[in-house]
A protein has these predicted regions:
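PLP-dependent class I/II
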Residues: 1-162
Length: 162
């Protein structure tokens, strides 16, 4: 689903040795019976139409995501927020500890004060404290605007601490 920007559809497939597939199927069968029918048809169409165009539009999509990712990483650097470079999803996970806010405080205030949504790192476990997850699965101009707003917010928070 990621190659075709079908975010949230939870579609995918596995290529693995037969014995591993058998084990994976046991887990899968007790987790979910199958993906929703609409999702299966959408995934099938994505694969069919992608094959017809040699995945040219997928390559363009990858370039677009890379541009958005670069916008975010460059913005974090300007803000003084360390962030590892993501390599497999549409999310960044910057460290916000330097702001003095918890992940929850940062996410709530950023939403309330700048209308920018992010997910507190603690949503992914205790070790996520001090981080937030931000998505770049949206239009490039929206990513740039969100980063400008986040920078204003971070500057305001840091100024208030001094």
């Amino acid at each position: 689903s990621k190659a075709f920007a079908m975010t949230g559809w939870r579609m995918g497939y596995v290529c693995a040795p037969k014995e591993l597939i058998k084990i994976m199927l046991k887990v899968h069968q007790y987790t979910i019976m199958c993906a929703p029918t609409a999702g299966q048809y959408a995934a099938l169409e994505a694969l069919r139409s992608g094959a017809d165009t040699n995945y040219a539009y997928v390559a363009e999509m990858v370039r677009a995501y890379d541009r958005r990712r670069r916008i975010m990483l460059d913005a974090y650097e300007k803000m003084g927020l360390h962030c590892f470079e993501p390599r497999g999803a549409f999310y960044t996970f910057p460290c916000i500890r330097s702001t003095g806010l918890t992940s929850q405080e940062f996410a709530e205030r950023l939403l309330r004060e700048e209308k920018v949504a992010c997910v507190p790192g603690t949503a992914f476990g205790e070790s996520g404290e001090g981080f937030v997850r931000c998505s770049y699965a949206t239009a490039t101009d929206k990513v740039a605007e969100a980063m400008a707003r986040m920078q204003r917010f971070v500057e305001r928070v840091r100024d208030a601490r001094t």
